UniProtKB/Swiss-Prot annotation:
The gene is valS. Catalyzes the attachment of valine to tRNA(Val). As ValRS can inadvertently accommodate and process structurally similar amino acids such as threonine, to avoid such errors, it has a 'posttransfer' editing activity that hydrolyzes mischarged Thr-tRNA(Val) in a tRNA-dependent manner. One of its GO terms (cellular component) is cytosol. Keywords: Aminoacyl-tRNA synthetase, ATP-binding, Coiled coil, Cytoplasm, Ligase, Nucleotide-binding, Protein biosynthesis. It catalyses: tRNA(Val) + L-valine + ATP = L-valyl-tRNA(Val) + AMP + diphosphate. Its main location: cytoplasm. ValRS has two distinct active sites: one for aminoacylation and one for editing. The misactivated threonine is translocated from the active site to the editing site. The C-terminal coiled-coil domain is crucial for aminoacylation activity. HAMAP family: Val_tRNA_synth_type1. Monomer. This is Valine--tRNA ligase. NCBIfam families: PRK05729.1, valS. Its EC number is 6.1.1.9. A motif ('KMSKS' region) lies at residues 520-524. Gene3D superfamilies: HUPs, Isoleucyl-tRNA Synthetase, Domain 1, Valyl-tRNA synthetase, C-terminal domain, Valyl/Leucyl/Isoleucyl-tRNA synthetase, editing domain.
Length: 876
């Protein structure tokens, strides 16, 4: 037995992970008789180091896989990383810029060499962080989204979907980043509320009779207007449908058309249509066969269709255009207006809705299959279930997916254009007469390859691959609720389309890690927390337990250093409890010496019963992914019952003369501590391995130890009830001692009036516990007691607990002291009451301050009532 006096996470964790990996503990057993359990890690981007969200995500996955391994499953936890197209390219671009060069200076091939070097560097950082977190990953199966095998899967999926008519090339409105000069996925667009303006302009009728009022937040796009639309049910405009207006500045005639898309109650009820620069306008344009006029180039500058504004930046054009409209008396008003504006997550540029020729996935048929699958036995279960509604809603409202990106880093689209005829060839391999063809320069959206992650990582498209046959479909996906649509949904429809099976059985969704004040963590706010710093200070086990138990499924988690520290204190409590137990168990006691059939004491039977109840609770809650509740159950059992009560109670036989009883106590201590370590292991892998190795045990590592199961022969319901009665009596005596300022070191007479003869006999049989915890000078247990005139009485389940006060305290002095305390409490109550009844304070003070005052009021009132009650007792 080698345990330091104080828990030191650095010493406990040093070298442990390397030992696990070296011994292949995390590799699947591949025992065909075992049921499989698979989780593929959501691949982190190779753009940088892992943040707290990653730590939370992977901790939950590791808890599940460690638990399943202990439950006898052939478990695979597969690692991997994502190439993260635009994000990584932006990082490499920035690095090149520091050297005074751009990717255009060095060309595509050389740039990709730099990108691969970046990937290798940051992949190494990520693996180091996985190790620090203690993740039970099988590194022999690590994958990367640009691996040859995964690239082959990507090409096959693209070609198959193209041949089915689901992938097509066409013109549609996409999110365009004018700075990075690429299309963006919706998740790469960050919407921020911006103080802008609502511009109201006059569009004169072509016949010269008045004007129609049009409002817009983007005046520069009006240069591409091709129509005005009104709602056919709007009585104000029934007579003008079919008429024409003149587009200001440009002079082009625009028809006034009827379309039910228009909101009658918004603005003037008339809307300009710019099909090439707004997704909704594009749909209207398609319905009415309107011309698509693009007025900007890919850099966000006005093109030659913008007439005299050609060459101006879009925002400069806006200013100039408004001034020109003012000069022509065509501005009705300009209102201050806060509206949501999309910004590129990478470049920060304002995203432009832009008509562009891109590659798209036709989503309706794929989404419908996903929806239909949720009505079958192959359905996917969402945790919490409410997120299934979110999934269904998004699938019902889905639009076609832009999958091409104007980048160099990524899966180059497997499409070639004939140099002479312009014919398109799409194939998994390049055309044989390659000299006559040029490949599409664009790459695929990162989400395209990550949508194949659950099956491409296991060997697909080779459906005979051993891993694909054995470990697919996977069992659980653990990820954040913010990417249900962007990633979860896409994995589901690709899995169904290409494997005819759901890619995973369960989806466990967690929230975001927020700062302690509830704000989102971000670099700009400077409130981010590096998980490696937390591990350095408190250890991986403290961070893991906090992350896993700090919230319920689907909810956000507020990071708190204080709470991580409290977990450290919990582990230190476990450490001290284990250390005491091991000192009493002794080095001579072996695993085979554990015998729970001997003469078990009441405390032994109680702790074994509570252990079995905790095993059942923890196992059942874990199956539902309710790790917050699991944490509470473990904390209460280990801290309150095992450490604070049973360990103290075990000192009675261990300090006694009965060797047989000592041996039984050693068995119970050893067995209970062993089972606690096993339950805690998925949450705290490092410290549990350290303690378990010091315990009498079978096997080489707790990683491969079996999960605890309920043993009915070790459940003693009657003993549990008896112990509950004893604990209540002990707590009552201790509380009464506090109330009359009598320390535990001072022996006092204690009377217990039992409800009946059975309870009396049980209490007498177990009075050793009362002697140890209450220090009576004289202990009387009977069914009838003459209660002294001056005494403190507490009603408990077993009857009454009576403490005579005569000679214990000076009654007059104690009453005077308590009355003085009561007076002080009354003054505090008056002060708080006055504050909370002040309307000015209640209306102006922050909610947090008001709540603090209310909490004070409640505390003072409880103290006041308690002191008043004690005075009445003493006077009685």
């Amino acid at each position: 037995m080698n345990m330091e006096p104080k828990y030191n996470p650095r010493e406990v964790e040093a070298g442990r992970y390397e030992e696990w990996v070296k011994n292949d503990y995390f590799k699947p057993s591949e025992d065909k008789s075992k049921e499989t359990y698979t989780i593929v890690i959501p691949p982190p981007n190779v753009t940088g180091k892992l943040h707290l969200g990653h730590a939370w995500d992977t901790t939950l996955q590791d808890i599940i896989t460690r638990m399943k391994r202990m439950q006898g499953y052939d478990t695979l936890y597969l690692p991997g990383m994502d190439h993260a197209g635009i994000a990584t390219q932006a990082k490499v671009d920035a690095k090149l810029k520091e050297q005074g060069i751009s990717r255009h200076d060095i060309g595509r091939e050389k740039f990709l060499e730099h990108a691969w070097s970046w990937k290798e560097e940051y992949a190494s950082f990520i693996r180091q962080q996985w190790a620090k977190l203690g993740l039970g990953l099988d590194y022999s199966r690590e994958r990367f989204t640009l691996d040859d095998g995964l690239s082959k899967a990507v090409r096959k999926v693209f070609v198959d979907l193209y041949n089915k008519g689901i992938i097509y090339r066409g013109e549609r409105i996409i999110n365009w980043d004018p700075e990075a000069r690429t299309a963006l996925s919706d998740i790469e667009v960050i919407h921020e509320d911006v103080q802008g303006h609502f511009y109201h302009f006059k569009y004169p009728y072509a016949d010269g009779d008045g004007y129609i009022e049009i409002a817009t937040t983007r005046p520069e796009t009006m240069l591409g207007d091709t129509a005005i639309v009104v709602n056919p049910n709007d009585d104000r405009y029934k007579d003008v449908i079919g008429k024409k207006v003149i587009l200001p500045i440009v002079g082009r005639e625009l028809p006034i058309l009827a379309d039910e898309y228009v909101d009658i109650d918004f603005g003037s009820g008339a809307m300009k249509v710019t099909p090439a620069h707004d997704p909704n306008d594009f749909e209207i344009g398609q319905r009415h066969s309107l011309e698509n006029i693009i007025v900007m180039d890919e850099n966000g500058k006005m093109n030659d269709k913008a007439d005299k504004y050609a060459g101006l930046d879009r925002f400069e054009c806006r200013k100039q255009l408004v001034e020109d409209l003012k000069a022509q008396d065509l501005v009705i008003k300009i209102e201050e207006h806060v509206h949501s504006v999309g910004h590129s997550e990478r470049s920060g540029a304002v995203v432009e809705p832009y008509l562009s020729t891109q590659w798209f996935v036709k989503m309706k048929p794929l989404a419908q299959r996903s929806l239909d699958n949720q009505k079958t036995d192959d359905r996917i279960d969402f945790y919490p279930p409410r997120f299934e509604n979110t999934f269904n809603r998004w699938m019902e409202e889905i639009r076609d997916w832009t999958i091409s990106r104007q980048l160099w880093w990524g899966h180059q689209i497997p499409a070639w254009y004939h140099k002479e005829t312009g014919e398109i060839y799409v194939g998994e391999e390049a055309p044989k007469d390659i000299d006559n063809w040029v490949q599409d320069e664009d790459v695929l959206d990162t989400w395209f390859s990550s949508a194949l992650w659950p099956f491409s990582t296991l060997g697909w498209p080779n459906i005979d691959a051993d891993d694909f046959k054995r470990y697919y479909p996977t069992n659980a996906l653990v990820t954040g609720y913010d990417i249900i649509f962007f990633w979860v949904a896409r994995m589901i429809f690709q899995g169904l389309e290409f494997t005819d099976r759901r890619p995973f059985n369960d989806v466990l969704l967690h929230g975001l890690v927020r700062a302690e004040d509830g704000r989102k963590m971000s670099k700009s706010l400077g409130n981010g927390v590096d998980p490696m710093d937390v591990i350095e200070e408190y250890g991986a086990d403290s961070l893991r337990y906090f992350l896993a138990t700090g919230s319920s499924p689907g909810h956000d988690l507020r990071y708190s250093t204080e709470k991580v520290e409290s977990v450290w204190n919990f582990i230190n409590k476990i450490w001290n409890g284990a250390r005491f137990s091991l000192m009493n168990i002794g080095d001579e006691f072996k695993f085979e010496d554990i015998d729970l059939t001997g003469n078990l004491s009441l405390a032994d039977k109680w702790i074994l019963t509570r252990l079995n109840e905790t095993i059942e609770t923890v196992t059942n809650l874990s199956e539902k992914y309710e790790f917050g509740e699991v944490g509470r159950a473990l904390y209460n059992f280990i801290w309150d019952e095992f450490c604070d009560w049973y360990i103290e109670m075990s000192k009675i036989p261990m300090n006694g003369e009965d060797e047989a009883q000592k041996q039984t106590t050693r068995s119970v201590l050893s067995y209970t501590l062993d089972q606690i370590m096993r339950m805690l292991h998925p949450f705290m892998p490092f410290v549990t391995e350290k303690i378990w190795q010091s315990l009498p045990h079978e096997g080489e590592t707790i990683v491969k130890a079996s999960w605890p199961t309920v043993r009915e022969e070790l459940v003693f319901e009657e003993s549990k009830q008896t112990m509950q009665q004893l604990v209540e009596i002990i707590k009552s005596v201790r509380q009464s001692r506090v109330e009359v300022n009598t320390p535990l070191s001072k022996a006092i007479p204690i009377y217990i009036q039992a409800k009946d003869e059975n309870i009396k006999a049980t209490l007498i049989e177990n009075e050793d516990y009362i002697h140890k915890f209450c220090n009576p000078s004289d202990l009387t247990i009977d069914t009838h007691i003459d209660i002294p005139e001056k005494a403190m009485t507490a009603v408990v389940i077993a009857g009454k607990v009576v403490l005579p006060l005569e000679g214990l305290i000076d009654m007059d002095k104690e009453i005077a002291r308590l009355e003085k305390e009561l007076d002080k409490l009354q003054k505090e109550l008056d002060r708080v009451d006055k504050k909370l009844s002040n309307e000015n304070f209640v209306n102006k003070a922050p909610e947090k301050v008001i709540n603090e005052e209310k909490e004070k009021q409640q505390r003072y009132q409880e103290k006041y009532d308690g002191v008043k009650n004690r005075i009445e007792q003493l006077k009685a």
